[in-house]
């Protein structure tokens, strides 16, 4: 989609499990442009780009005093304004730009609407990290991935014959809501899996590694204190649905 003289908007993602997971191609583009705008950029990656002569403008302050939805809208508008008035604009955020990233998906849609030339550099997404972590042979067994809130909205989407990865688990529970907000999700899972089905909570701690806790579906409540913004829930139908004690592992 890029024009001969280069794209007006460039989207790139840094890794979901390591701050330095930024592809060589994305780094080369950042050096070529000489400046980037970024959201949630870790200090190690900012320092790396600075050593390469890239000026980094963080947009995190646009969230100050605003609800998250308004903050995301402000970030998107700031990126689009640069792409339109002072291109090229390169925006770096966590994960793969077109997977589990509402801002970058919106930016792609707006770039197409405004007929802005665009280039996207994929990043290491949470799905990539988890597939590698738990050793899923996606080509053989398949893998159903959907956000927890998306599953609640489309109950018929659940396929108990394939391993299930529920993304954005914390999104089921609005800020300030009680743990009872997870009730409908648990009931939906109980309708498809036995009470003894092992389920694994996976939290991505960035540079701190990945933590896992496995319990039976009947004991979902034991996972509640550990659910955070990075949490995903994995249901591995390859494992026999038998009662087991909670296990924890940190890599």
Predicted regions and their residues:
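Class I S-adenosyl-L-methionine
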Residues: 1-20, 24-121, 223, 231-232
């Amino acid at each position: 989609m890029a024009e001969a003289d280069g794209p007006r908007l460039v989207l790139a993602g840094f890794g979901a499990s390591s701050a330095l997971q930024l592809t060589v191609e994305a780094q080369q583009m950042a050096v070529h442009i000489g400046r980037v705008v970024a959201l949630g950029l870790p200090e190690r990656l900012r320092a790396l780009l600075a050593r390469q002569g890239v000026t980094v403008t963080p947009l995190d302050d646009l969230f100050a005093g605003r609800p998250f939805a308004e903050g995301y809208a402000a970030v998107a508008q700031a990126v689009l304004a640069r792409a339109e008035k002072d291109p090229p604009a390169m925006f770096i955020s966590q994960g793969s730009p077109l997977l589990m990233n509402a801002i970058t998906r919106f930016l792609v849609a707006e770039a197409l609407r405004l007929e802005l030339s665009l280039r996207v550099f994929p990043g290491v997404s949470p799905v990539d990290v988890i597939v590698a972590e738990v050793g899923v042979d996606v080509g053989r067994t398949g893998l159903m991935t959907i956000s927890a809130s998306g599953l609640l909205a489309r109950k018929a989407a659940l396929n108990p014959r394939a391993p299930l990865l529920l993304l954005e688990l914390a999104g089921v529970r609005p800020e300030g809501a009680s743990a009872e907000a997870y009730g409908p999700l648990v009931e939906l899972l109980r309708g498809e899996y036995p009470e003894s089905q092992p389920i694994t909570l996976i939290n991505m701690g960035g540079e701190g590694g990945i933590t896992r806790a496995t319990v039976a579906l009947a004991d979902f409540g034991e996972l509640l204190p550990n659910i955070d913004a990075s949490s995903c829930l994995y249901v591995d139908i390859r494992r026999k649905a038998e009662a087991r004690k909670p296990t924890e592992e940190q890599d």
